[in-house]
Amino acid sequence: MEPTITIENIVASTRLAEDFDLQKLLDTGLKGAVYNKNKFPGLVYRIENPKAAFLIFASGKVVCTGTKNVENSRIALFNLANELNSIGYKGIYLKPEIHVQNVVASANLRTSLNLNAVLSAFGVENVEYEPEVFPGLVYKLADPRVVVLVFRTGKLVITGGKCPEDCEEGLRIIKTQLDNLGLLY
């Protein structure tokens, strides 16, 4: 059975205004928002539908994280723009341009791996493996530009993609390489 990708998190960003007065946002009705400029320069705000968290910065930029697909990131950011507009905040861009910054996915090869053998077979050019520091092997692919964390259990974490297809291609590449080297049992 072929391993499948599970999208764990999408990080997307946009600009929703020229700037924000974060204290004013907090005071005017973003219920549940948290802002402590001494600890973090942004306001943190969460919504439930779709489930997402936002980092809202004084520069007008917003980072959305926690969604499981790109469409939900778009919906969450549009919902935030509409909510800011509805509480009376002026100058909100209601049709923001959204940029996916990172896609994090997981997969399971359903077999255990000898990471020392993987390191030997892959070479050290794009691979880091220091089990006394981190239990996973870190494999950096050039195209697509993703990082695959490989664990001895056969579980993978793929990060750095700009779209889900980057993560799928990263999985295909590493599975093919492991298979061709006889490292999948």
Curated annotation (Swiss-Prot):
Looking up InterPro entries in the UniProt record yields:
TBP (IPR000814), TBP_CS (IPR030491), TBP_dom_sf (IPR012295)
* Listed GO biological process terms: DNA-templated transcription initiation
Positions annotated as sequence repeat: 7-84, 100-178
GO MF terms here are:
DNA binding; DNA-binding transcription factor activity; general transcription initiation factor activity
Which UniProt keyword terms apply here?
Answer: DNA-binding, Repeat, Transcription, Transcription regulation
- The lineage's top-level taxon is Archaea
Q: What does this protein do?
A: General factor that plays a role in the activation of archaeal genes transcribed by RNA polymerase. Binds specifically to the TATA box promoter element which lies close to the position of transcription initiation.
The UniProt entry, under PANTHER family, shows:
TATA-BOX BINDING PROTEIN
| Similarity annotation | Belongs to the TBP family.
- Protein's name according to its UniProt entry: TATA-box-binding protein 2
